[in-house]
Amino acid sequence: MCDDEVAALVVDNGSGMCKAGFAGDDAPRAVFPSIVGRPRHQGVMVGMGQKDSYVGDEAQSKRGILTLKYPIEHGIVTNWDDMEKIWHHTFYNELRVAPEEHPVLLTEAPLNPKANREKMTQIMFETFNAPAMYVAIQAVLSLYASGRTTGIVLDSGDGVTHTVPIYEGYALPHAILRLDLAGRDLTDYLMKILTERGYSFTTTAEREIVRDIKEKLCYTALDFEQEMATAAASSSLEKSYELPDGQVITIGNERFRCPETLFQPAFIGMESAGIHETTYNSIMKCDIDIRKDLYANTVLSGGTSMYPGIADRMQKEITALAPSSMKIKIIAPPERKYSVWIGGSILASLSTFQQMWISKQEYDESGPSIVHRKCF
C-alpha cells in the first residue's frame, strides 16, 4: 500500500497551533494557529473577495474585524465543522497536497474521549478520502523525538498538560495524569493580572496580543518568593512591550507570576496539583522498579514548556519530592515546541510502522471503531 515515493502527511493538531508536514522531514513545513475567524461586521465593499470564514494566519492578520474561535479546547475537538476547515486548509493551502494520495498521521492527547478519535477517523476517510491513517498519542511521539524508549513526558501545550510514563516503548495508561491547565489558561491569567496594572484586554483579538506578550516576556522563577521581593525592590525585572497601536506598556512581576500558575494552580482557582507534583504522582503510580528510570528521563515537550528557567525549576521541585539519593534529570530539548510533530515524522517513516496504518479497506469493513483496535 505504502510505496516509498508517497510520503505520509504528519499533522499535529494542537489546541493552539497546528503543525503539519511530510514524514521524514526534520521540521514541520506549516505551523499556523488553530483558529477559525468569522467577520464581526457586515461587508460593504463589493468584489473584495470577502469570505465568511478565515483560517490560521489569515484569520490572525485580520483579527481586528473577526471573532476568533479555537475549535480544539483542552485537546478535545469541540467544533467539528471548524476542525474540518482547519484540515482542509492544512492539506490544500498549506501543504498543497491531495489527501486522497497520502497516508495521514494525526495526533491526540491521552485520555481523550473515544468518540473524538472515531470522529477524526471518520472525517479522514469519508471527507478527505485518505488511503490510510493513524492516530498517535502526542507524548509518546515526543519521547521518540528525544531518542528514548523509556521516560516520563511532561507535555504541556495550549490546551492541556499531561504526564505520560513510558517504559520500553509502552505507555502505562494507569499512570497517565492529565491536567487541564495549559498555555491558554496562562494567557487568560496574564490578561487578568495586566488589568490590575490598568491595561484592559478583553476581545478575542486582544487575547492574541497578550499571548504574544506571554511568549516574548514571561519566564519561570527559580524561587518565586525571592523573585517577588526583587521585583518589589527594584525595576530591574521590568520590560516594555509595544502594542500594535504604538502604545508602550511595562510589565514587571507579571512576567513570572503568569507561568508560576503551572506550579501553583491555586492562582487561577484550580484545586489540582502543579506540574511538578503531577509528574511526581505519575511516577509514583508506576511500578517501584521502573521509577528510577523515569526520574532520570523526565522529558519536557510542548510550547508551554518553553519558558526560560522551567527546567531548572522542575529539577528543584522534583528533587524536593523524590527520595534524596535519586538521580533526577530533566531533559528539555531546544526543539521541544515541535517535538510531537518531529516524533510523528520519525514514526511515520519507520519501515516497521508501515503495517500499522489503518487502511481505507479496513475502515470500510469495520467502521470508525477500528481506531481503538489499531491505534494504542
Curated annotation (Swiss-Prot):
The modification N-acetylaspartate is found at residue 3. Residues 1-2 form a propeptide. It comes from the Eukaryota. Disulfide bonds: none annotated. Keywords: Acetylation, ATP-binding, Cytoplasm, Cytoskeleton, Hydrolase, Nucleotide-binding. PROSITE patterns: ACTINS_1, ACTINS_2, ACTINS_ACT_LIKE. Coiled coil: none annotated. One of its GO terms (molecular function) is ATP binding. It is found in: Cytoplasm; Cytoplasm, Cytoskeleton. Transmembrane segments: none annotated. The keyword Iron-sulfur does not apply. Signal peptide: none annotated. GO terms for cellular component: cytoplasm; cytoskeleton. Belongs to the actin family. Actins are highly conserved proteins that are involved in various types of cell motility and are ubiquitously expressed in all eukaryotic cells. This is Actin, cytoskeletal.
